[in-house]
């Protein structure tokens, strides 16, 4: 929530809160009481089950408290029809290595390097690209 301070105050203790979670493909977006909270791209768990969880209780005085959910709705068909527009999303975090999310691409971001060739590489003080003939491996030494 450090990227989204308004989300920190969205949850209301001792009251019903409305949560919206959109997990579509590698995109996970959340809202609490209409406030965008998280907008994450992550490919770690593309499939799985839905669970309602209460995290560990660290304070003995909190043991036995009641946690309740109501009016749970799950959409598995025609999902795109019910997705919230991008304009109502939290700041985006892309956790998928070496990719650009659709929103990042729309904003003009590109990968610096394709990870396979030297295309896109350039010397720090050069205006030209690097070729294979200029690459040289150096022995790695550890200093203990």
Where are these regions (language model features)?
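Carbohydrate-interacting regions of secretory-pathway proteins
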Residues: 1-136
């Amino acid at each position: 929530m450090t990227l989204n301070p308004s989300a920190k105050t969205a949850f209301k203790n001792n009251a019903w809160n409305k949560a919206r979670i959109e997990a579509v493909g590698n995109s996970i977006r959340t809202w609490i009481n209409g406030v965008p909270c998280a907008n994450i791209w992550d490919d770690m768990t593309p499939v799985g089950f839905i669970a309602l969880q209460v995290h560990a209780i660290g304070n003995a005085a909190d043991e036995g408290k009641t946690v309740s959910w109501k009016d749970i709705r799950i959409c598995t068909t025609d999902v795109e029809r019910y997705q919230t527009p991008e304009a109502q999303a939290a700041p985006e975090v892309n956790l998928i290595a070496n990719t650009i999310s659709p929103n990042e691409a729309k904003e003009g971001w590109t990968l610096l390097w394709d990870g396979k060739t030297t295309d896109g590489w350039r010397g720090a003080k050069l205006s030209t690209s690097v070729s294979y003939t200029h690459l040289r491996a150096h022995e790695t030494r550890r200093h203990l």
